[in-house]
């Protein structure tokens, strides 16, 4: 979601989630996701980013605390990209 033009400093919100242990074993662990997404931010020149993490939360559960916090931060303009 790009809310501003290319010249505007970016505050990037990064949401990561794993719902099962099986996913974590297959390389989708929280730490693996963070590592890949941090590398992507660095490759894009984005140095201001925040991770929002929900562990053990199903995608079916719409009440995910970190996702809700990230969405509030977007609404408040704290995060300009996600």
Curated annotation (Swiss-Prot):
Top-rank lineage group of the source organism: Viruses
UniProt KW Cytoplasm keyword: no
Record-linked SUPFAM superfamilies: Resolvase-like (SSF53041)
Source organism of this protein record: Bacillus phage phi105 (Bacteriophage phi-105)
Keywords: DNA integration, DNA invertase, DNA recombination, DNA-binding
Example of a GO biological process term: DNA integration
Entries under InterPro entries matching the protein: Recombinase_CS, Resolv_N, Resolvase-like_N_sf, SSR_resolvase
PROSITE patterns associated with the record: RECOMBINASES_1, RECOMBINASES_3
Protein family: Belongs to the site-specific recombinase resolvase family.
Name the UniProt record assigns to this protein: Uncharacterized immunity region protein 3
Active site (UniProt): 19
Start and end residues of each Resolvase/invertase-type recombinase catalytic domain: 11-82
Tagged with keyword DNA-binding: yes
Any GO MF annotation of the entry: DNA strand exchange activity
């Amino acid at each position: 979601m790009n809310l501003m033009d290319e010249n505007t400093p970016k505050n990037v919100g990064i949401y990561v989630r794993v719902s099962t242990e099986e996913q974590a074993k297959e390389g989708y662990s929280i730490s693996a996701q963070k590592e890949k997404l941090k590398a992507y931010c660095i490759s894009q020149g984005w140095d201001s980013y925040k991770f929002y993490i929900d562990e053990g939360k199903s995608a079916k559960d719409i009440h995910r605390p970190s996702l809700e916090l990230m969405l509030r931060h977007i609404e408040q303009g704290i995060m300009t990209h996600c």
